[in-house]
Amino acid sequence: DGQDIIEKEGYIKVDEKAEAYKAGDAKGKVVVMGSSSVGPVMEKLAEAYQKTNKNITVEVQVSDSTTGINSATEGVCDIGMASRELKDEETEKGVKATEIAKDGIAVIVNNDNDLEELSSDQVKSIFTGDITDWEDVTK
């Protein structure tokens, strides 16, 4: 069910052998907050969940990963959405991640740049701020 929705939405399944969800007698409202890149697939998952569980309302609020994690930690929402790994200080607060999908990301470098390729570690260092100058990439 859920993994099929994830694949249909263009993400990569993380559990080929996941069992189909079986409806229960859940009632009430579930608030999900966080990552704008997870939001669209979470909307589809919420729709499917609500069809199976008629007495549940799922509200998806899109912002960013940090807001989703903090909101879940602080009890503002029931589930936080994140499109990044948890930071040490987040896991120290007891936050646990459950991966639901993988997504592809492309990094485009201007044609005038002499750099011919970037490793995953270099991209990570650029986005975490460890590398702030192109000259440092080639070292």
Residue ranges: model-predicted function:
Residues 1-139:
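Flexible loop/hinge segments at secondary-structure junctions
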